[in-house]
């Protein structure tokens, strides 16, 4: 089941923090695109993944946001409570690490969109010959599969496989990554053989995923901190639609983003003020890029060739 988010008051936050405090065994500060995020937990399996996933932060820096991650029999499974004033999130009975790291990124996004004019995009971002491509879509549409398919080409470099931050600079959009390593699926190597052996079988968690250093496969120079975004491909999976690929007008692309919650289920606050902010950011994003809609009901290779055709790349072979 998906997790549920409830907004809480600062007073409720204080009560929950006091309740969790005696159980805290691990306190880790990490840097996520300039934000200091503090993880507090008693789960011995969590710190290793977290520290492999995100860059370390000096312990002398005060945190901008906090994540408490604990089991609690008094709470339902996958319960998230968030105080937007102190930027503190409580995750109770959330065992899937993918949600832990996405909520951490969502917490950073909440801070950055309010205070620095920086937007969050739940999607993959790669650089091909100096031009940035973003792929977004609902869960299961294939953005991760197609991202790693593109990385098989030596001219492709990756910024992020799941989440990036974007900022307007004049006529351009700069896209920034924030993760040290990526949380990948075990079945990736079944689709693209180049990734076979990247992670030992016993290192995958119960969800069939692991935090992996893809530099071992693609090389150290192919993980970039940023790129200039020029193209957005929105992925969908609709077996009833025979059309595979089509360009989108700006209004069509904006409508798809807004109707689908910006393709981001990890936004912690959804209210009229935040919606106005996000509509403006996404409008800026779309207004400075070429947008396409791609139906991914074909084979991974067929979809990969369609993505490459947009970029003027040779077929996937």
Kindly give the residue locations of the regions a language model identified:
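A noncatalytic interaction/capping subdomain that flanks phosphate/NTP-handling catalytic cores
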Residues: 1-134, 139, 153-154, 164-317
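Conserved glycine(s) of the Walker
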Residues: 141-143
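A conserved segment at the C-terminal end of the G1
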Residues: 145-157
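Active-site flanking residues adjacent to catalytic metal/cofactor-binding acidic residues
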Residues: 161
